[in-house]
């Protein structure tokens, strides 16, 4: 199966230019292709995964991927289908983000061997280009009429009170020139990107033909949608980042575990490297079993292993199992740090707090009275152990201090998992 056929079977092609010619070229020879990543934050998020993984799929098929980091275009920001103008970031901020994104792209691609991946930065060619060169060598090849007819531009112009600045309007010229420059420097003949990039990609194809007299191609990947209509890649806490310091491997694992049954088989095709046949077997087994599908577990394992590695996957599984067990002794200090980052609602507490106060502080009880009821019913666990009366000499005016949170409830001298019932958790972080 060719790489184009594989992408088609996974539903990963939204639009292409001359797909028959592209497929024939890919079957005849190995090519160089690229995808651009503008640094708009200090980390990539799961919305970037489809193009990143597409580069990897092409490399596995023997082609040379180029990861282009937008050190120059990131200073402006792509306006495509954005409701309002982006805020401009300082050169220092963008430069820092470029370094972060370069390091995050590295694990997905191989930079060794005959088709070693290439890392490029468009600041290398735009940094020395002056305004006159830009207008004379690039601007003259673009029709303002055609640019105004782009859907992404029309939406901004037609939206009340929005409009578009010349800076953002000219963005497609910069991205278009990227293609021409990478074609000249590295022989790139294919640009891939999200479906919102179609206008910018076709602009680059036309400019490359004009400047270099070369036939090149474009391919876009679909917009990832969820069956319930909500935005993919967002949680109540915000974006799901690829940086483990922004989204913990545990939370990342949980995100994929919670994928809806209606989406999970599509996402296995989109995001994993399991074959279509293997995914079909998983789906058939799930349908035949009549019980809880295995697909979400497989998806969560595949994605966490791919992004964070085997050790992080083991930690995510260990945390998941321990939260609902009475024995939490397997949790490491690093596991607790993940929970403090984003795994559980975390609350700072000081010595002298009792179980009733902790329940109310964390929102696991609405009142002291309700909290006492939970404690008396043995429904409260501290690091997996039932909250017990341990302070017979408490002051008479503070009866709840009978259930003082003492040292034995602290793991690594710093953490206590407070659990009420089977599924309600909070993390106490001791000052």
UniProtKB/Swiss-Prot annotation:
Intervals of motif 'HIGH' region: 39-48
Residue numbers binding ATP: 234
Alphabetized SUPFAM superfamilies for the sequence: Alpha-L RNA-binding motif (SSF55174), Nucleotidylyl transferase (SSF52374)
Listed EC numbers: 6.1.1.1
Record-level GO cellular component terms: cytosol
Chief place where the protein resides: cytoplasm
GO molecular function, one term: RNA binding
CDD domains: S4, TyrRS_core
GO biological process: tyrosyl-tRNA aminoacylation
Record keyword Nucleotide-binding present: yes
Binding site for L-tyrosine: 34, 171, 175
Domain S4 RNA-binding per the UniProt entry, residue ranges: 353-422
Subunit structure: Homodimer.
Function: Catalyzes the attachment of tyrosine to tRNA(Tyr) in a two-step reaction: tyrosine is first activated by ATP to form Tyr-AMP and then transferred to the acceptor end of tRNA(Tyr).
Similarity section: Belongs to the class-I aminoacyl-tRNA synthetase family. TyrS type 1 subfamily.
Protein name, UniProt field: Tyrosine--tRNA ligase
């Amino acid at each position: 199966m060719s790489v184009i056929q594989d992408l088609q079977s996974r539903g990963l092609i939204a639009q292409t230019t001359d797909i028959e010619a592209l497929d024939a070229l890919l079957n005849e020879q190995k090519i160089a292709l690229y995808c651009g990543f503008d640094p708009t934050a200090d980390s990539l998020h799961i919305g970037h995964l489809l193009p990143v993984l597409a580069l990897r799929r092409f490399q596995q098929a023997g082609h040379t991927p180029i990861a282009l980091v937008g050190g120059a275009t990131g200073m402006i920001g792509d306006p495509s289908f954005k409701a309002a103008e982006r805020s401009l970031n300082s050169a220092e901020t963008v430069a820092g983000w470029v370094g972060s994104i370069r390091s995050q792209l590295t694990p997905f691609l191989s930079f060794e061997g005959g088709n070693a991946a290439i890392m490029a930065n468009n600041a290398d060619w735009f940094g020395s280009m002056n305004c006159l060169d830009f207008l004379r060598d690039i601007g003259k090849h673009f029709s303002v009429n055609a640019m105004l007819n782009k859907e992404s531009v029309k939406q901004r112009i037609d939206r009340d009170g929005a409009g578009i600045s010349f800076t953002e309007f000219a963005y497609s010229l910069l991205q278009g020139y990227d293609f021409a420059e990478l074609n000249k420097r590295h022989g790139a003949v294919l640009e891939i990107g999200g479906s919102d990039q179609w206008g910018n990609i076709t602009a680059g194809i036309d400019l490359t033909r004009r400047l270099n007299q070369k036939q090149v191609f474009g391919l876009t990947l679909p917009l990832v949608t969820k069956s319930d209509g909500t935005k993919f890649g967002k949680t109540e806490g915000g974006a799901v980042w690829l940086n483990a310091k922004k989204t913990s491997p545990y939370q990342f694992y949980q995100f994929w575990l919670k994928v809806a049954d209606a989406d999970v088989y599509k996402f296995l095709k989109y995001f994993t490297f399991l074959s279509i046949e293997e995914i079909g077997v998983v789906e058939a087994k799930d349908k035949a079993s009549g019980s809880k599908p295995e697909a979400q577990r497989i998806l969560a394992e595949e994605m966490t292993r791919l992004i964070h590695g085997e050790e992080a996957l083991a930690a995510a599984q260990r945390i998941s199992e321990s939260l609902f067990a009475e024995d939490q002794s397997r949790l490491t200090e690093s596991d607790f740090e993940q929970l403090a980052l984003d795994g559980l609602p975390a609350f700072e507490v000081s010595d002298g707090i009792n179980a009733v106060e902790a329940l109310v502080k964390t929102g696991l009880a609405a009142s002291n009275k309700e909290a006492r009821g939970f404690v008396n019913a043995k429904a409260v666990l501290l690091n997996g152990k039932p909250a017990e009366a341990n302070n017979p000499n408490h002051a008479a005016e503070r009866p709840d201090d009978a259930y003082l949170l003492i040292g034995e409830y602290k793991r690594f001298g710093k953490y206590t998992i407070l659990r009420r019932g089977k599924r309600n958790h909070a993390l106490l972080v001791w000052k």
